[in-house]
Each structure stands twice: as structure tokens, then as C-alpha cells.
Regions:
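Residue patterns forming the tRNA-binding/recognition surfaces of aminoacyl-tRNA synthetases
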Residues: 1-151, 168-169, 232, 264, ...
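Alpha-helical recognition segments enriched in aromatics with Gly/Pro capping
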Residues: 8-20, 126-128, 147-300
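Short, amphipathic alpha-helical segments that act as regulatory/interfacial helices
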Residues: 237, 315, 319-326
């Protein structure tokens, strides 16, 4: 109704007071609670012979998430950040293309959100939060906010915290000699709205990157769950572009959320929750770390006892491979016993070639934040190339050759390089 009214230039009509009753200018029903008035309105329409039909329909209706009571939407004065008057939308869309989005579909997601979003409603009606530092003339309702008034609030907040806004009246909070530009009055009242919490988090780049000497703008990366394209990534982009003209980050990485082995959300009522403490107690912290590193975080990340058991076996194979190599260095002096690669056998040079390939895969994966690729490359190298092939072949050299034999030193050098 509101959108249709705006389209045809109709006045924004909001006849409901803050306490949920019709305002006095509503004929017949002024002062009556809106939901109790439904029956009265039906009776009045019937009495005026204007009620064509009355029936119940099952439909979706907004309810309070906390108390489950029905709610209504009211048109009330709010503070907004315009997306178009100063070109914020266009500039933000341009800056999106300067950022590395990981995974790449994140770019399309946030681009579509910024492209189609309405103006940002900045104000909230809550009991406590970060106040909007604005004053209103009590005589003509003119808004009062100046550089001097903002500086005064900044000084008070620095000394007393934002609680001072709620504890003191407007006279204490305003600079001396403040006058209304509309009527010249010196009587003001505070604005009672607080800032949207997404504005609070959205300016963290200014609070952190500009206040800490060892940091600089923009941040190398913002990392959060995929829901933050609508949240932190979104608000940070708008506040940074609005203030500096540039995105606050070089890259944005988003991850999915932990689900069970069937892809279902973790829930105590379903009984599919896997607690980290129980994994650490049974398998050790390294297995939990390996699970995190092995998962492709771009989508939902599955976890279950069966998955952890498989990762535990993989961890044991990697660890045992390393233990075998470390166990053969007792008589090996790096300073005196290292061998030249060009003096080694084809087998030794081959495994070093395989190592070089694996290192290349891992370095490339690190650059792309594809940690699961690193796990798979490392696991395959340990199990296939080393344990089942190279280490199995060189056991004779290690166990039967004299301590200083060239072949034995070649094998030790290769293992040391690995």
C-alpha cells in the first residue's frame, strides 16, 4: 500500500500511535487498540451497509520473534543514508570490481544486493546502543547538528563513554551558545534513536586500521560466513566508500557452515551435534585441525564421527611417514653429510622432482586460499609417493649399507630436503 501510494503521490498516512492505538483523528475508532478494533470496524461497516463479505483466510502474517504476538508496519520518521543522491550506489558497485572475492560468486551476490537495495535506514528504536548525536529544537523541530556539537559529543564519549548521552540532558551535551538556525531558540531535546548495529560493525575499518600504527588501509582480507554479504561485508563497503571513496578490503573470503554428514544443520533437538571437545578428547587437537584444513569451506562443511575417524587414519599415515624419516637422521650431520643432487640416483632425483611438483601445488593453493587442495596433495604425496614407493625401496640402503655409504647419505639427504 505504501509503495503504491508513493507511486501516485498520495500522502503517507500513519494513523497509529506508538502505543498501538488509533490516533484521535481516526473517526469512530480514535484511541482504540488496533487489533481489538477489528471487530468494531466490521460492525461499523455492516451498519453502514458497506461490508460486502466477511470471511477468515489463512495467510502469512508478521509476528514478533520473541513473544509471538502479531505486529504491524508503521510509517514513522527515521534517519536514512541515501544510496543515490551522492552517488553511493554507483561508487560502491565500481569498488566491488577492485576486490578479490573468494569464492568468485561472492562478487555477483554482493553486487546484486548493492544494485537493488533501498536507502539504508540508519536509525533504530532501542533502549540502548550508540546514539545518533543530533538535537531537535523544542519550538520549531529544526534539526541541530554541527561540527562543534559533534566534537563536543566526541570529547564526552571519550571521557565518559556513550552512556553519558542517556544520563545527561541536551543542555549538558551541546556546545555553549547553541542556537536554532530556524527560530533562534536555545531549547533543545536529544534525538532518541540509536544507530543500526550494522553501522557500528561497518565502521570497524576506521576504528582499527586508522587507529593502530602497525596497520594500514585497506585491510588485506575480510573473512566471515556467507551470510555476511548482507551484513558486515555490505555495511563496511558502504561506510568506507561513503567516507573515503574506496573499498575497505583487498579481498573477501566467505565460508559455509558446519553441517552433519547428511548436510543437515547442527541441532540439539535432532541430536546431530558434534562437539569439538569430544573430538579433541578422543582423537587429539591435530585431527580436528586436519579436518578444518581438509574441508572445502566454500559450501557446507560436513562433520561426523565417521568423517573424523577417516581423518584420524589420514593423520596417522602422514605422521608415521614423517616419523620414519625423522628416525633415520641419528647419524646424519647436515653440515658434513649432505650430498649433491646431481650425484644421486634417478630414483632419488625422481622423488625430489615429485616433491617440487607438490610444493608448487601447495604454494599455488595457499595463494588461492584452497587449503583442502594442500591437504590432498600432501596426503597423496606421503601415502603414494613416499610410504608405498620411495621409502619402501630405500629401506635396504638405510638398514644394510655402512653409515657413510654414498647411497645411504643420498637417501638421508633426500629425506632431509623433504
Amino acid at each position: 500500500d505504501h509503495v503504491a501510494g508513493r507511486k501516485y503521490g498520495l500522502e503517507c498516512y500513519s494513523p497509529v500511535e506508538d502505543n498501538g492505538v488509533f490516533s484521535d483523528d481516526v473517526q469512530f475508532f480514535g484511541g482504540e487498540f488496533i487489533f481489538k478494533a477489528n471487530a468494531t470496524i466490521n460492525e461499523k461497516l455492516k451498519a453502514l451497509n458497506l461490508l460486502l463479505k466477511n470471511e477468515n483466510l489463512a495467510h502469512s502474517y508478521p509476528h514478533c520473534w520473541r513473544c509471538k504476538k502479531p505486529v504491524i508496519y508503521r510509517a514513522t520518521p527515521q534517519w536514512f543514508i541515501s544510496m543515490d543522491k551522492m552517488g553511493l550506489r554507483e561508487k560502491s558497485l565500481e569498488q566491488i570490481n577492485t576486490v578479490q572475492w573468494i569464492p568468485s560468486w561472492g562478487r555477483e551476490r554482493i553486487y546484486s544486493m548493492i544494485e537493488n537495495r533501498p536507502d539504508w535506514c540508519l536509525s533504530r528504536q532501542r533502549s540502548w546502543g550508540v546514539p545518533i548525536p543530533v538535537f531537535h529544537c523544542t519550538k520549531c523541530s529544526e534539526i541541530y547538528v554541527t561540527r562543534e556539537s559533534v566534537d563536543k559529543i566526541h570529547q564526552l564519549f571519550t571521557k565518559h563513554s556513550s552512556d553519558i548521552w542517556f544520563e545527561k540532558d541536551a543542555r549538558f551535551l551541546m556546545p555553549e551558545g547553541a542556537q536554532c538556525s530556524g527560530c533562534g531558540s536555545t531549547e533543545f531535546k536529544k534525538d532518541h534513536n540509536i544507530l543500526d548495529i550494522w553501522f557500528d560493525s561497518g565502521i570497524s575499518h576506521a576504528a582499527v586500521l586508522e587507529e593502530r600504527g602497525n596497520l594500514s588501509r585497506p585491510a588485506d582480507m575480510y573473512l566471515e560466513g556467507s551470510d555476511q554479504h548482507r551484513g558486515w561485508f555490505h555495511s563496511s563497503l558502504l561506510t568506507a566508500v561513503g567516507r573515503t571513496g574506496n573499498a575497505p578490503y583487498k579481498a573477501v573470503l566467505t565460508h559455509g557452515f558446519v553441517v552433519d554428514e547428511n548436510g543437515r544443520k547442527m541441532s540439539k533437538s535432532v541430536g546431530n551435534v558434534v562437539a569439538p571437545d569430544s573430538i579433541i578428547k578422543q582423537y587429539g587437537a591435530d585431527v580436528l585441525r586436519l579436518w578444518a584444513a581438509s574441508a572445502d569451506y566454500k559450501a557446507g562443511i560436513s562433520i561426523s564421527d565417521n568423517i573424523i575417524r577417516q581423518l584420524s587414519d589420514a593423520y596417522r599415515r602422514i605422521r608415521n611417514t614423517c616419523r620414519f624419516m625423522l628416525g633415520n637422521f641419528d647419524d646424519f650431520n647436515v653440515m658434513t653429510d649432505m650430498r649433491q643432487i646431481n650425484q644421486m640416483s634417478e630414483l632419488d632425483r625422481f622423488i625430489l622432482h615429485r616433491l617440487h611438483r607438490v610444493v608448487g601445488i601447495c604454494l599455488s593453493a595457499y595463494e588461492k586460499y584452497e587449503f583442502h587442495t594442500i591437504y590432498h596433495a600432501l596426503h597423496n604425496f606421503c601415502v603414494v609417493d613416499l610410504s608405498s614407493f620411495y621409502l619402501d625401496i630405500i629401506k635396504d640402503r638405510l638398514y644394510t649399507s655402512p653409515a657413510g655409504a654414498p647411497g645411504r647419505r643420498d637417501a638421508q639427504t633426500v629425506m632431509f630436503i623433504i
